[in-house]
Amino acid sequence: ITGVSAENFEVLFVSLVTTPSGFITIIPDYTGIGDPDKYHPYIIADPHTEAVVNMIRGVKELAIELEDSNDRFQFNDQLFLIGYSDGGYATLASQRGMQLDYPDEFSITASFPMAGPYDLSGTMVPYFLSEPEYSQPYYVPYVLTSHLWYYQGVDVDFGEYFEPFWAD
């Protein structure tokens, strides 16, 4: 748990509920969340999937390394994925990525993606365009800047997308 997530009640709550029940709980630190100098690729599948896959692999390696020590823990064949909001999106993206790209490495027992923005082009965009006012005015620019940075690089000219006051 990073310094950022250690102060997050939801992160601590999930850890406190699942770990004493015998589950190995892995909470990935997505790109840009624990490091303010990096942008977070919000609702972009590949970086989320990569973070989850690498975290699971790392914990599996640690289990093997600690096999003969007093700190050992045991993996079984069950893999549960769960997430809420951006984590819900990450859960569904990771499930899809694991099933398509790593079918021999990961077998998912159950997946619980909750309250994530799953269907941007089919649901979210038409909704945003139909509303005269959106209650969370930061959200659309957050999604847009995330996608621009990820797909076009950090030298994006935001003046092409926003009024000059907001582009600066």
Across the structure, where does each feature detected by a protein language model lie?
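Short, surface-exposed "cap/lid" segments of acyl-processing enzymes
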Residues: I1-G22, D35-P36
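Alpha-helix capping and helix-loop boundary segments enriched in small/acidic/polar residues
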Residues: T2-F9, Y39-P47, I82-D86
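Short beta-to-alpha linker loops that shape the active-site pocket of alpha/beta-hydrolase fold enzymes
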Residues: D29-I33
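Alpha/beta-hydrolase active-site loop
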Residues: Y42-E67
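Accessory cap/linker subdomain of secreted extracellular hydrolases
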Residues: M114-D168
